[in-house]
C-alpha cells in the first residue's frame, strides 16, 4: 500500500520534515512531480540538508528512493546532489520515463519570464514540460544509448534553430550540449531504471511506499491560482499517474499545512499581511526559499483555500507545521471566508481577483517551541488546533513545533 504526502497551500509547507520523520517506516520514498525548482529542507542531528530533486528518504540507509516519471530532471543539479551522499547504489532510482531539463529550457524560461512575470525560478521547468507535452522531449532512458541520444539531440538542434538568437544560446550551443551529456550522462546512468515496474511489483508484494509531492496544491496547473502556478499537477492524483500505481493502492493522504500561510513569487494571496506582522512571520519562520532564497510573502491561515485543497486531495489526515512561529503573538487571525464586491464567498473561486479576507481572531499563546505532547501546549494553542480541525473536517495527526525532527507532537 502507498501513502501520499501532499502540500495543501502554495508550497514550502514543511513536507520534507514530515517525510523525513516517517520515512523509516517505509520501504520506498518516491518523489512524484516537479523539478529542481522545488526545495525542501531537513534538519537532522543539527545539520541542515537542502534537497531539490532527491527524495527525503535518502537519510535512511534502508530506504529505497525513486524519482518518478512526472519529475523533470536537471542531470547537472542531480549529480551535484548525489555527490553529497555516500553509498546510494541500490538506494536511488530514476525513472527512465522522466524528462531531462536542457540548458536551453532555462534560457527559454528566463526569456519568457521577462514578459509574463509569473515569478518562476527560471530553471527551465515549464519549457521542459512544454516539450514533454509536444512529444519532443529527451527522456532519462535516452541517456542509456548514445545512438538514441544523438538522434534526439539532432532533432532538438533542428527544432530550436529559429530561436537560438532570441534565447541567447551562443554559437557553440551544439558542441556545449554534447559536452554536457558527455560529462553527466555516465554519472547518472547507473541510477536509471524502469521504476514503474519496480513500484508495481513492490505494491503487489505488500511493501510500504511513501509518495512525496513537491510544491503545493494551490500551484497545480489545472486547479491552482492560474496563471500563477507551476507546470505540473501537484495534487495527490498525480502520484498515481506519475508512478504507475493504481488509485486502489493509495491508503492515507497526508495534507501538510503551516499554521499560517506563505507564498513565493507573484499571484493572488488574499490573507497576505503586508504590515510589520508579515515581516515578523517571515523572520520567525525563516521564510526564505530553499531554492531561490527569495523572501516568502507571509500572512494568516486561509481556511477557504485549506478546505478546497483538502477536498481536492482527499486528505485523510493533516500535519500542522510551524506552530511555534506564532508564539508570542497576542491576536492570531484566520481567514474564514472571502468578500468580493459585497458578496461573501466560502468556496474557493477560479479567480481570486478582488477577494478580500474575512477574519476570525483568536487569542495567542506564549510558547509552543519544542513541545512534544499535546497536553503541554497552552490552552489557546489547543483551541486554535481544534478550530482548524472542526472547520476543515480532517483530523490533525501531527504538529511540528520546531525544525528539529524530534520536536513533533503525534496525535
Regions found by a protein language model. Give the residues of each.
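Non-transmembrane, aqueous-exposed alpha-helical and coiled segments at domain scale
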Residues: 1-411
Amino acid at each position: 500500500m502507498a501513502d501520499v504526502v501532499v502540500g495543501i497551500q502554495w508550497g514550502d509547507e514543511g513536507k520534507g520534515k514530515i517525510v523525513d520523520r516517517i520515512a523509516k517506516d517505509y520501504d520506498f520514498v518516491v518523489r512524484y512531480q516537479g523539478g529542481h525548482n522545488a526545495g525542501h529542507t531537513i534538519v537532522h542531528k543539527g545539520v541542515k540538508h537542502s534537497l531539490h530533486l532527491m527524495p527525503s528518504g535518502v537519510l535512511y540507509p534502508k530506504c529505497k528512493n525513486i524519482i518518478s516519471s512526472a519529475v523533470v530532471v536537471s542531470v547537472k543539479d542531480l549529480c551535484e546532489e548525489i555527490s553529497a551522499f555516500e553509498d546510494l547504489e541500490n538506494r536511488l532510482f530514476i525513472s527512465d520515463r522522466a524528462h531531462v531539463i536542457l540548458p536551453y529550457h532555462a534560457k527559454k524560461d528566463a526569456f519568457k519570464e521577462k514578459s509574463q512575470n509569473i515569478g518562476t525560478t527560471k530553471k527551465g521547468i515549464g519549457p521542459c514540460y512544454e516539450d514533454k507535452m509536444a512529444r519532443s522531449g529527451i527522456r532519462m532512458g535516452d541517456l542509456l544509448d548514445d545512438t538514441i541520444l544523438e538522434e534526439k539531440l539532432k532533432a532538438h538542434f533542428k527544432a530550436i534553430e529559429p530561436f537560438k538568437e532570441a534565447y541567447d544560446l551562443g554559437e557553440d550551443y551544439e558542441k556545449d550540449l554534447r559536452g554536457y551529456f558527455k560529462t553527466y550522462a555516465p554519472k547518472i546512468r547507473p541510477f536509471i531504471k524502469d521504476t514503474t515496474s519496480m513500484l508495481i511489483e513492490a505494491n503487489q508484494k505488500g511493501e510500504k511506499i511513501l509518495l512525496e509531492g513537491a510544491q503545493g496544491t494551490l500551484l497545480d496547473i489545472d486547479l491552482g491560482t492560474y496563471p500563477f502556478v507551476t507546470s505540473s499537477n501537484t495534487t495527490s492524483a498525480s502520484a498515481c499517474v506519475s508512478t504507475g500505481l493504481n488509485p486502489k493502492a493509495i491508503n492515507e493522504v497526508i495534507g501538510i499545512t503551516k499554521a499560517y500561510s506563505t507564498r513565493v513569487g507573484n499571484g493572488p494571496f488574499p490573507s497576505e499581511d503586508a504590515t510589520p506582522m508579515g515581516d515578523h512571520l517571515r523572520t520567525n519562520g525563516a521564510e526564505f526559499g530553499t531554492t531561490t532564497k527569495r523572501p516568502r510573502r507571509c500572512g494568516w491561515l486561509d481556511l477557504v483555500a485549506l478546505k478546497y485543497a483538502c477536498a481536492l486531495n482527499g486528505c485523510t489526515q493533516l500535519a500542522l507545521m510551524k506552530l511555534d512561529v506564532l508564539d508570542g503573538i497576542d491576536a492570531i487571525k484566520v481567514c474564514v471566508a472571502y468578500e468580493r464586491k459585497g458578496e461573501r464567498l466560502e468556496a474557493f473561486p477560479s479567480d481570486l481577483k478582488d477577494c478580500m479576507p474575512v477574519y476570525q481572531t483568536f487569542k495567542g499563546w506564549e510558547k509552543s517551541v519544542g513541545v512534544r505532547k499535546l497536553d503541554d501546549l497552552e490552552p489557546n494553542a489547543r483551541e486554535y488546533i481544534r478550530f482548524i480541525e472542526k472547520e476543515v473536517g480532517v483530523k490533525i495527526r501531527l504538529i511540528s513545533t520546531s525544525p528539529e525532527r524530534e520536536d513533533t507532537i503525534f496525535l
